[in-house]
Amino acid sequence: MKRLLFPALALALVAVPSAQEPDSKPNFSSQSELVVLHVSVKDKKGGYVGGLSQDAFRVLENRQPQEISFFHNQDAPVTVGMLIDASGSMAPNRDLVIAASMAFSKAMNPQDEFFVLGFNEQIHTPLPAEKPFTNFEPALRVALVQAIKARGQTAVYNAVNAGLDYVQRGGFERQVLVVLSDGGDNASSTTRAQVLANAQASNAVIYTIALVDPLDQEADPGFLSQLSESTGGVSFRPKNAKEIEDILQQVARDIRNLYTIGYVPSEAAASQARREALRRVAVDVRLPTGQKLAVRTRRAYLAGAGEGSGDVR
């Protein structure tokens, strides 16, 4: 996939006290037209199926078989973005969200790298510019505290666009966003349709947690659900904030059990794609016995998109 670059959005940068972090430079490789699929594979009982080889996977784009360029088994390192609603409605849940997010980071692969974006009507990047990603627990905790100031309106569309751009600057092909919000937007400069198109054009998988006040008429959990579904992620709607930690533990397990497949569209698929910007994708996974397994991944991606607002600089 081509790298998305969104026009600049003015951001409020939050200063964070510096902390000593382990210095690591993760490996990264990319191709301009590389399509990345994150694939969850489960058996009939709903359990994750591990240990599969590349030969078990078959990829189709617009019904044309594709040659897999790279294949990562489960639990390969991930670049993870935590996008946390910091509008006034978040105030009662602030401490629970911070604690749940820290527990989530501990449940992930120690090699993973994290970034945090807090958002109200502005987008806050609490990690320092010279170290925009971290797997150092104290730095992550400080970033979470700084990100959630719980005030102002909500620009969730801008925040997702910013996260989609930011995550591509990380060191790993596996890219994940986790969005905690009610989905309502009253301050973005971009539209719902634009951000959904940008999500479909990215290689990131998005998990969403809809923290919805039943009395809030601006909440839009449907947007969050659509965002997750379009990228092969999962959307959750907890009954109360106390369920956030359990949900984030589920998200951590799901991420660590994902397979990641990359391919460059074949000439036949690319030729058809010139006429159809939305490219349909299907992944078939079978055991050596021929038994078909349940697969979750994105069902399409959007070629040639990337116009929007929310660049983090």
What residue ranges belong to the model's regions?
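Scaffold/interface architecture of coatomer-like assemblies
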Residues: 18-313
